[in-house]
């Protein structure tokens, strides 16, 4: 049996303001820092250790990972950063308030943008400063791979190959792997591992700052998964994510 641990970054400044974030490179909030520190302490208390870590190129995931590893005295392990683990790109919605968009477009439309599998948000123009092609960190990424917006289906299409090509080989080598990522890049992995339908993944909310453990068999199929948190705490955190369309 193999194990892999995933964690969604701690609360970001834009999570706190209830804004669509996507690839916008915002920092952790004070609460997000506390969540990451708590996660690191929890993993250490539960006896976890890691040989290698993977994260995105966005600072909220990178800083979460750094804080977790610091609490575990594992600052020295190899860390691989890749844009394919980035959050889903929310296109023209990035920087807009979720509750205000609900008032403007209706709850059903915003739920489709946030939680459906194959409905993308409104796209950016390439002249928009929010387009990743205008950010030097993506200079080596082929232009046709840089999104103007993404559905969860699009996100899965870029995340799963990275999982298969980079993360799975490390797991099969017997390395203890930690992934620090984002709500939708994690939902993409969860959907793939658990063979969930679009309807099932639409109901799945990933809370910030709580380690999610997957136990995998020799074929990298899930045996079981669980969060390192008690049920009441977990439910409250999941409900926070679900309620974002109402909170200004």
Curated annotation (Swiss-Prot):
Catalytic residues (positions): 9 (tele-phosphohistidine intermediate), 87 (proton donor/acceptor)
GO molecular function: phosphoglycerate mutase activity
Swiss-Prot/TrEMBL GO biological process terms: gluconeogenesis; glycolytic process
Positions contributing to substrate binding: 8-15, 21-22, 60, 87-90, 98, 114-115, 183-184
InterPro entries assigned to the protein according to its UniProt record, in alphabetical order: His_Pase_superF_clade-1, His_PPase_superfam, PG/BPGM_mutase_AS, Phosphogly_mut1
Reactions catalysed: (2R)-2-phosphoglycerate = (2R)-3-phosphoglycerate
Annotated coiled-coil segments of the chain: none
Top enzyme category: isomerase
Keywords linked to the UniProt accession: Gluconeogenesis, Glycolysis, Isomerase
PANTHER family for this protein: PHOSPHOGLYCERATE MUTASE
NCBIfam families listed in its UniProt record: pgm_1, PRK14115.1
Recorded family membership: Belongs to the phosphoglycerate mutase family. BPG-dependent PGAM subfamily.
HAMAP family: PGAM_GpmA
Entry protein name: 2,3-bisphosphoglycerate-dependent phosphoglycerate mutase
Species: Coprothermobacter proteolyticus (strain ATCC 35245 / DSM 5265 / OCM 4 / BT)
Lineage of the organism: Bacteria, Pseudomonadati, Coprothermobacterota, Coprothermobacteria, Coprothermobacterales
The gene coding this protein: gpmA
């Amino acid at each position: 049996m193999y194990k892999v641990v995933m964690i969604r970054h701690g609360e970001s400044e834009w999570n706190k303001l209830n804004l669509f974030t996507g690839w916008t490179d915002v920092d952790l909030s004070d609460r997000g820092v506390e969540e990451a520190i708590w996660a690191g302490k929890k993993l250490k208390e539960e006896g976890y250790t890691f040989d290698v870590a993977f994260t995105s190129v966005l600072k909220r995931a990178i800083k979460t990972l750094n804080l977790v590893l610091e609490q575990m005295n594992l600052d020295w392990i190899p860390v691989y950063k890749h844009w394919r683990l980035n959050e889903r790109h929310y296109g023209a919605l990035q920087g807009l308030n979720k509750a205000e968009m609900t008032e403007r477009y209706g709850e059903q439309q915003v739920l489709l943008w946030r939680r459906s599998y194959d409905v993308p948000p409104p796209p950016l123009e390439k002249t928009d400063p929010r387009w990743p092609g205008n950010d030097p960190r993506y200079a080596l990424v082929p232009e046709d791979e840089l999104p103007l917006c993404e559905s969860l289906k699009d996100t899965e299409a870029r995340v799963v190959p990275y999982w298969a090509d980079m993360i799975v080989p490390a797991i099969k080598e017997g390395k203890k792997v930690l992934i620090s990522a984002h709500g939708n890049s994690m939902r993409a992995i969860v959907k793939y591992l658990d063979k969930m339908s679009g309807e099932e993944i639409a109901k799945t909310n990933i809370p910030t700052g709580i380690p999610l453990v997957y136990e995998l068999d020799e074929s990298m199929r899930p045996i079981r998964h669980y969060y390192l948190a008690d049920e009441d705490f977990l439910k409250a955190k999941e409900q926070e994510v679900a309620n974002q369309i109402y909170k200004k």
